[in-house]
């Protein structure tokens, strides 16, 4: 989705992507290239973003800004219909666990940061900063028209998924 956001941001600003060299790199490779001074610009995230700023980088675009421009991006979990029909109890358990995790994140940020730091081998400061840049949407709010919606009222996520899918097809991804 970062590639999608980058190209949408360039289009919004009237910049032709063919006027530059765009590289598709993994996060750690971006950070290393940035540290070496090999890149003029990059779209990446914590824990490397803060380090880039410390080395003279300036944040001029974020996924939050792009969401306000009409390009939200999402992290979602999906299952195949066949799996959901065969194992509805597992799907229900997963959704409940996911919702409990989101609630824990929202209600216990300090403890969540410790867990993330340990799990991802990050400094606590990096994990805390990373969390601040991540919006966790409570499950009840996900069932509103802005997000997933309901079976009777399909939410904005469906539109976003269609736009992103068309983009990925156009990029042969």
Per-segment meaning from a language model:
Residues 29-120, 125:
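Pocket-lining segment of extracytoplasmic ligand-binding domains
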Residues 3-21, 53-55:
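Ligand-binding cleft/hinge of the Venus flytrap
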Residues 2, 27-30:
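Conserved donor sugar-nucleotide recognition element shared by glycan-biosynthetic enzymes
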Residues 85-173:
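Secondary-structure end/capping motifs
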Residues 21-23, 60-61:
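General small-molecule cofactor/ligand-binding pocket signal
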Residues 21, 39-40, 155:
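Residue-level marker of alpha-helix boundaries and capping positions
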